[in-house]
């Protein structure tokens, strides 16, 4: 059976990033969903400038379709075709790798033509046909641990990728269900998943979600993003995933748990300090 890579390199040239438990933290960041070309470029420009000033590797993320909205009326995004055009333009302009989530087998090949990292949503982390189709694109995979899975259960998830010929997999912690409308983050999961051999990413913003907690939409407690992110980075992770928006309270999705764009410099400075200590 193919071994997973403990050091995953993504992108090319000056924008290339490395995910490794032993190397400097890499950031995955961007708005929850792609709202427009103009909005994507605005957020990306701010993040690129910030990450350059900090010497921090950046993967830009955004979703073309929020397929698991709480309500049928929830806004879902601009769609696959338009989003791929925007992602291609973003890569040409800024040089960074990009990440987006996929929901069906049919989307894998189309998205992989442009996107560097295919993300498997937590709710779909056991869907074998989707995982195999994603693996066969050859792109790096970021698979979110299902809220219903133990960290050691990710061994079987990881094997679906490696046995399909893809060793470039990131395992992402995003909280575990704890009763109704509540998630908790068990920091033990980070070293447990790292012991499986793949780099581990901590999703600091979805971990503070309150699923369905607002009745027709998901709630969240963004005031705890920094607390959990600092804890995870202190334990030791290859990357941290943070959704951000210039006006989270008026964002079309996941506003309650997104970090205001203006607060990102302070957050990242603190996380890099913790990362330096954890990996000293």
UniProtKB/Swiss-Prot annotation:
Compartment(s) where it occurs, according to its Swiss-Prot or TrEMBL record: Cytoplasm
Catalysis performed (reactions): D-arabinose 5-phosphate + phosphoenolpyruvate + H2O = 3-deoxy-alpha-D-manno-2-octulosonate-8-phosphate + phosphate
GO molecular function: 3-deoxy-8-phosphooctulonate synthase activity
BP terms from Gene Ontology: keto-3-deoxy-D-manno-octulosonic acid biosynthetic process
Name of one Pfam family that matches: DAHP_synth_1
Pathway in which the depicted protein is active: Carbohydrate biosynthesis; 3-deoxy-D-manno-octulosonate biosynthesis; 3-deoxy-D-manno-octulosonate from D-ribulose 5-phosphate: step 2/3; Bacterial outer membrane biogenesis; lipopolysaccharide biosynthesis
Enzyme class: transferase
Coiled-coil positions: none
NCBIfam families: KDO8P_synth (TIGR01362), PRK05198.1 (NF003543)
Family recorded in the similarity comment: Belongs to the KdsA family.
Protein name in the entry: 2-dehydro-3-deoxyphosphooctonate aldolase
Species in which this protein is naturally found: Rhizobium meliloti (strain 1021) (Ensifer meliloti)
Gene: kdsA
